[in-house]
From Swiss-Prot:
Species of provenance: Lachnospira eligens (strain ATCC 27750 / DSM 3376 / VPI C15-48 / C15-B4) (Eubacterium eligens)
Membership in a protein family: Belongs to the DnaJ family.
Gene: dnaJ
Matches recorded under SMART domains: DnaJ
MF-aspect GO terms: ATP binding; heat shock protein binding; unfolded protein binding; zinc ion binding
Protein name: Chaperone protein DnaJ
Binding site for Zn(2+) 1: C151, C154, C208, C211
Amino acid sequence: MADKRDYYEVLGVPKDADDAAIKKAYRQLAKKYHPDMNPGDKEAEIKFKEASEAYAVLSDAEKRRQYDQFGHAAFEGGAGGAGAGGFDFDFGDMGDIFGDLFGGMFGGGGSRRNSNGPRRGADVRVNVRITFDESVRGTTKKIDVTLKDECSSCHGTGAKPGTSPETCSKCGGRGQVTFTQQSFLGMVRSQQPCPDCHGTGKIIKEKCPDCYGTGYISSKKTIEVNIPAGIDNGQCVRIQGKGEPGVNGGPRGDLLVAVIISASTEFERDGYNIFSNVVISYPTAVLGGEIKVKTVDGEVLYEVKPGTASGTRVRLKGKGMPSVRNAAQRGDHYITLIVDIPTKLNQEQKDALMAYEKALTGNERHGKKKGLFGK
C-alpha cells in the first residue's frame, strides 16, 4: 500500500474539503479521464480508476473517517472485493455524476426517480417593458403569452377519441428499463428512460388528430400582471399556476415575468437609493439659498448652505425608491450639487466681480482662508 497515492492528493483537494468540493473535483477528473473520452488511453483509464476509488472513500462519511484515522491500511482487509481497495463501490451518487456528464450511460440516479409519476409543469418566462416612473409607483400590464392546455378531444391522453394509450410492453409501464453491463469498474446496474415510450410508460397506437398525440393544445392568452412599486430592472414577477401544464396529474408551472425598465434621463438607481445632479448658481453656492430639487415624488425644497463647494453630496432621507416588499420603507435620494461657473459675463457683472476681487485680503486672494465667511 506504500505506493498508493493519498486520496486527497488524487482529487486535488485539502484534507478539510467539504462534500461539495470533493464532488466537484471528482466530476472534473471523471470528465477528463473517462475511458469513453480517451479510448485506448491506458494511463487515462488508470487515473480514472484512481479518482473513482478516492471519491468512493472520501464521499462516504464513515469510510472517510476511517481513512483519515488509518490511511490506506483501513481497507487492506478483505481485498479483492467488487471495487478497488478492498471495498464495494456505491454507484448511487456516481450514477448521478456520470449521468450528468455522459447522458445517463451509468444510471443509478434514475432508480430514485419515478419518471411515470406526477411531475410539475415547466415555468414559462416572458419579458415586459415599463418606464422608470412606472417602476416607482407600480403598474398593471397586460401581456400576451402562448400556453399549452389539455386537449379537450382526448383529455390529455394523446390518443384518438374512443381509444386509449396502451401499457408499454418493453418497460411494463414503468417508463424505465434496467440493464447490467460489465465495465472496467466491475458490473454496473443502470437505468435509462425507456426508448419505446420515452419514459411515459404508455404507447399511443392511434394519435389524437387535434393535438397530434401530444395531449395539449397551444393557444395565445392575455394575462394581467400587477407589477409592484420599487421593482428593479431584471426582477421577475411570479404568477403561480400560469406556466406549462403538469405531467401525469402534476401541477402547472409558473409564469415568470421579467421586468425591463427603460432608463431615466434624470435619475440613476442603485438598490433602493436614487442619485441625481442639481446645478446651482455661483451666487447661491456662495451666499446660500433655497432651491427646488426634482425627486421621484415631485419637487421638494432644499436649503443650500453658504459656501457650498461644487460636488457636495446631499442626502434626502426617505426620498428614494419604495421597497418592493413594503412600500412604506424607502431608500434615500442623494443629490450632487454642481456649481455653475459663468463663462459669459456682461460688463456690469465683470465690474462686480472685480470689486469683489479687490475687497479680498492677500490670504483670501491666494486661497489660504479656510472659508469665504471665516473670520
